[in-house]
């Protein structure tokens, strides 16, 4: 059997909803515009939704099946749909967290609090890295960052070598690669050798 050597995890904070990209909801589309059912609102406090006036909103996108696997994609991602047979899609995840940051922590670490290794940290811990001189886990950012910040790529209680390295799209691509002005290289070497 094949053994995984790498993983590309795409997390699009602020991106389109999954129901407009990868997760068709025919029943939701059939109920579009109708009030929220009591089964969803009873004994639930919402931070930003007025239960009395809230209505269900289905997707306006068109979904079609792609590849031999028949994975469904919306018309918003035609190029990604062309890779359907090379992708793994997980549609069974859910959370009781309704605020973004705790929900993001659940997605990345399995729990809604700080200090735990993220999925990327566990992957580098388990799979290792093909290079000792390059990071095994990198994070790409569009520039504005995430509401979860570095807590979404931390190593938690695993050694820090398993934390994600942020690659920035603006300014210095990777922070702290050069010595501060005035720090002699031999002083840094002594610190590393200590």
Report the location of each language-model feature:
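Ligand-binding pockets and gating/stacking loops
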Residues: 1-194
């Amino acid at each position: 059997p094949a053994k995984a050597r790498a993983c590309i995890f795409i997390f699009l904070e602020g991106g389109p909803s999954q129901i407009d990209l990868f997760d068709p909801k025919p029943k939701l589309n059939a109920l579009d515009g109708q009030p929220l059912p009591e089964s969803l609102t009873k004994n639930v406090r919402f931070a930003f939704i007025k239960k009395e006036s809230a209505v269900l909103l289905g997707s306006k996108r068109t979904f079609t099946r792609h590849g031999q696997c028949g994975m469904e994609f919306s018309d918003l991602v035609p190029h990604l749909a062309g890779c359907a047979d090379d992708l793994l899609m997980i549609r069974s995840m859910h959370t009781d967290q309704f605020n973004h940051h705790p929900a993001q922590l659940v997605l990345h670490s399995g729990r809604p609090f700080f200090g735990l290794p993220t999925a990327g940290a566990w992957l580098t811990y388990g799979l290792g890295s093909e290079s000792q001189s390059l990071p095994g886990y990198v994070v790409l950012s569009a520039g504005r960052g995430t509401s979860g910040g570095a807590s979404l790529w931390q190593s938690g209680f695993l050694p820090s070598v398993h934390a994600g390295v942020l690659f920035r799209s603006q300014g210095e691509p990777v922070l702290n690669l050069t010595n501060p002005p005035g720090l002699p290289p031999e002083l840094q070497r002594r610190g590393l050798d200590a």
